[in-house]
Design a protein with these regions (language model features):
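Inter-repeat boundary and helix-capping residues of tandem alpha-helical solenoids
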Residues: 3, 90-97, 114-115, 122, ...
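Non-catalytic, well-ordered alpha-helical scaffold segments
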Residues: 8-12, 41, 45, 63, ...
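Short, well-ordered loop/turn and helix-capping segments at boundaries between secondary-structure elements
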Residues: 19, 66, 71-75, 131-135, ...
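C-terminal boundary/linker of central alpha/beta nucleotide-binding cores
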Residues: 2-71, 98, 102
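Leucine-rich, hydrophobic repeat-scaffold detector
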Residues: 82, 102, 106-109, 123-242
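Short, amphipathic alpha-helical interaction segments positioned at domain boundaries
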Residues: 63-99
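P-loop NTPase catalytic cores that bind/hydrolyze ATP
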Residues: 11-20, 26, 116-137
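Short, contiguous acidic/charged loop-to-helix segments that flank catalytic cores in large enzymes
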Residues: 2-5, 35, 74-75, 87-92, ...
Length: 242
């Protein structure tokens, strides 16, 4: 296949499929690789049963394909995991994840385009930075307003917390402090309903992490309540809950 379609092209496609969290849509493969649909159709046909469609995404049919891709393009040692891999292999794996994270970021949260949905951005970008061990970039991603909203809508509080716990294992950081800094940076209009909704979601998440007694958590919980009263009056759901 490399001889027919180019070793560089095949390496790029197989490496990005290896790095993806749970496969890629064909539109994402085309966007990432820059291939034209007809070019990709020939390559896809040549790859045959090594790839399968899983809920609209292409994934490797068997683990042996993941191993083969790792061995050929990332100096792998004939195993799936990172344990026992050489420093060269680990670096190449991190590079593959980092490159995919950057691609998703370049298309994420842009109105009027459909290559990367908010749901896919929330699924892939934090995961890719974590796998790349780019801790500062992961932290920056998690404290972006649109990413926070997307994760809480399309993923879960548990998943968001898991990223922060991984961060705390590797760098000096604090969830509440980082979101307090981010909140100030966002410069939101506190009278808008969307601001109140976000404040409540963030307060709920911080409470979920065990920080319900912290000053910033209380502050945004109070803001959410005041915003709800301002927008809806005393009979709103948040008001009654509080």
């Amino acid at each position: 296949i490399e001889g027919d379609y180019g070793a560089k092209t095949l390496k790029e496609i197989m490496s990005v499929l290896w790095a993806a969290r749970a496969g890629l849509r064909e539109e994402e493969i085309l966007g990432y690789s820059g291939l034209k649909p007809m070019q990709w159709a020939y390559i896809r046909n040549a790859l045959g049963p090594t790839l399968i469609d899983a809920s609209g995404r292409l994934i490797f049919a068997h683990d042996y394909m993941r191993i083969a891709v790792s061995d050929r393009y990332m100096a792998g040692n004939n195993t799936i995991g990172n344990e026992g891999q050489s420093q060269e292999a680990l670096k190449l794996r991190c590079n593959a994840h980092s490159k995919l994270a950057k691609w998703f970021e370049s298309y994420a949260f842009k109105d009027g385009q459909s290559i990367v949905s908010d749901e896919r951005a929330a699924e892939e970008i934090p995961y890719q930075w974590q796998q790349a061990k780019e801790w500062k970039k992961l932290q920056t991603t998690l404290t972006k307003q649109k990413m926070l909203i997307a994760i809480l809508k399309h993923r879960s509080e548990q998943e968001l917390l898991s990223y922060w716990l991984k961060l705390e294992e590797n760098i000096k950081t604090d969830i509440e402090t980082q979101y307090e800094k981010a909140w100030k940076k966002w410069k939101l209009d506190q009278t808008e309903e969307a601001t109140g909704d976000l404040a409540q979601k963030l307060a709920d998440f911080l409470s979920f992490t065990g920080r319900w007694h912290q000053a910033f958590t209380k502050k945004i919980a109070d803001l959410a309540l005041e915003n709800s009263i301002h927008v809806h009056g005393n009979k709103s759901e948040i008001t009654n809950r509080s």
